[in-house]
Amino acid sequence: MSRPRLNIDGDTLKLEEILQVARHTVTVELAPAAAARVKAARDLVDRVAAGDTPSYGINTGFGTLAEVRIDKKDLRELQRNLILSHAAGVGSPLPLPEARVLLLLRCNVLAKGYSGIRPETLALALEMLNRDVVPVVPERGSVGASGDLAPLAHLALVFIGEGEAFYKGERLPAAQALERAGLKPVVLEAKEGLALVNGTQAMCAVGTLLQLRAEMLADLADLAGAMTLEGLLGSHKPFIPEIQDVRAHEGQKACAAHLRELLADSALVESHVNCSKVQDPYSLRCMPQVHGAAREGLSFARRILEVEINSATDNPLVFVETERIVSGGNFHGQPVSLALDVAAMALTQLSAISERRVEQLVNPALSGLPPFLAKNSGLNSGFMIAQVTSAALVAESRVLSHPASVDSIPSSAGREDHVSMGMTAALKGRQVADFTRSCLAIELLVAAQALDYRQPTRAGKGPQAAYELIRSKIPTMEKDRELHRDIAAVSALIDSGELLNAVRTATRGQ
């Protein structure tokens, strides 16, 4: 059965389409108009390479060695040496989904027609993607300008039959992986090595998947907060439209609307309508303001990433219309670095306020429930250490939220004297997302135990659906047990999408 097809043209790629490629569920093809642009740019590079005029990256050295002229007979060796010398990454390989996206994003940049790649080299890249030949790319070694040189060099190694690649998940020498897939390596011609290694695609590969996950976690944070609110018999009034309209931040309005949707048809809110409590703590009452600010930060990051993945970030750039090959700075990752720092800070705020809500749940002076929600407390410790784990994750997330985008270490003998550290921002953002997911899993688990004490009165549509799904997998804690298993089980419901899907079905009929 044929798979759905995704045409790339360098201009219209969407974040959601990237997720399909990460999961290897579509066949990627080059749009005809893009193919024509690629050929025209290559023809111009060939004309320049045949002449005697110096042109960076075509017949010169690289970086600080740009003033060194290269003889025509050595142009192929120049490109090969570039790939070999720049493949200096260290650390664990990018996970397969991120490495697939890296290859896709490089193809999309080449499809714009400003890089001067040969059509047959781009065709090899697309065939690798479609036949599941995924380069082994160490995740550390990029300072984010001139783009992600080391990660992209490891990607390019496979094109020339060097390095390593995964073929259908099996790690192999690149030449063997290509052979198994029925592909042959290429010999790089003038400028092609540079066309493969200059750009921000590694930070964007990690960053786009981080962004999509962060947006999911923002929805999950609203759900966890709503579930805690119901478990604590909190008020729905702070979420009414009138309060949001007089401040009018879009993120705040979106969060409040989502909370109202989740809490609809709550019997619990009616059960304490005449209680003496006047106000809830900030971690409950101010969810629209805090979660909403995080949403706005993520909206900013999305806008930057949507532009970046469809941008020409090579250097030099090939302008066919004016027959010029011009050096510039589009490889500099500062926009992406700043955006991913903001995304990490947004996620850290979601985990920080979640941890405070867990404290509300387990503290009997605040919840009116048994200490740590334990039955026969004293003999049982209940969720005491779950809150400690959440606090530890928040503390580490705060350290990781120090912005990478304000750091810069000059390189290349001072020629590259300001860099973005965009890959650093992406990698630490990915870690923060992991921690945020775990914090929210803990809150959902603890909130479910609180709702046990409120049964049979039903919570709002969203929390009730989440509660019922969690309880179908994880029983009420009657006595102490290994909590890490329960946290992992809730995390699995989150990662699979099952939890949010169940909630959306209950609240929207989707």
From Swiss-Prot:
Annotated metabolic or biological route of this protein: Amino-acid degradation; L-histidine degradation into L-glutamate; N-formimidoyl-L-glutamate from L-histidine: step 1/3
The keyword Disulfide bond is assigned to this record: no
InterPro entries reported for this sequence: Aromatic_Lyase, Fumarase/histidase_N, HutH, L-Aspartase-like, Phe/His_NH3-lyase_AS
UniProt similarity note: Belongs to the PAL/histidase family.
EC category: lyase
Entry protein name: Histidine ammonia-lyase
Organism expressing this protein natively: Stigmatella aurantiaca
Transmembrane regions listed in the UniProt entry: none
Record lineage: Bacteria, Pseudomonadati, Myxococcota, Myxococcia, Myxococcales
Catalytic reaction list: L-histidine = trans-urocanate + NH4(+)
Top-rank taxon: Bacteria
GO function terms (MF aspect): histidine ammonia-lyase activity
Residue numbers bearing the 2,3-didehydroalanine (Ser) modification: S146
Pfam families: Lyase_aromatic (PF00221)
